[in-house]
Amino acid sequence: QMTCRISGEVFTWCGTTCPLTCENFRNPPKHCPQGCFVGCMCRRGLVRHRNGRCVRPPRCYY
């Protein structure tokens, strides 16, 4: 099992190519390239902050 270094991340063998971020979680991308992202992604319910961490959406504004 692969591990991720950043708190709130989980390793995936086939994650979305359009992960949610603080910039797009209110209006998620509608058209993502097909395929799988292999690597560490934020766990469900968390989004990627511009500082690289995984946060709950209300924390995007801090």
From Swiss-Prot:
It is found in: Secreted. Gene3D superfamilies: Laminin. Disulfide bonds join 4-40, 14-36, 18-32, 22-60, 42-54. Expressed by the venom gland. Its main location: secreted. Keywords: Disulfide bond, Protease inhibitor, Secreted, Serine protease inhibitor. The keyword Disulfide bond applies. GO terms for molecular function: serine-type endopeptidase inhibitor activity. InterPro entries: Ser_inhib-like_sf, SerProtInhib-TIL_Domain, TIL_dom. One of its GO terms (cellular component) is extracellular region. Residues 4-60 form the TIL domain. Belongs to the serine protease inhibitor-like (TIL domain-containing) family. Serine protease inhibitor. This is Venom peptide SjAPI-2. It comes from Scorpiops jendeki. The lineage of its organism: Eukaryota, Metazoa, Ecdysozoa, Arthropoda, Chelicerata.
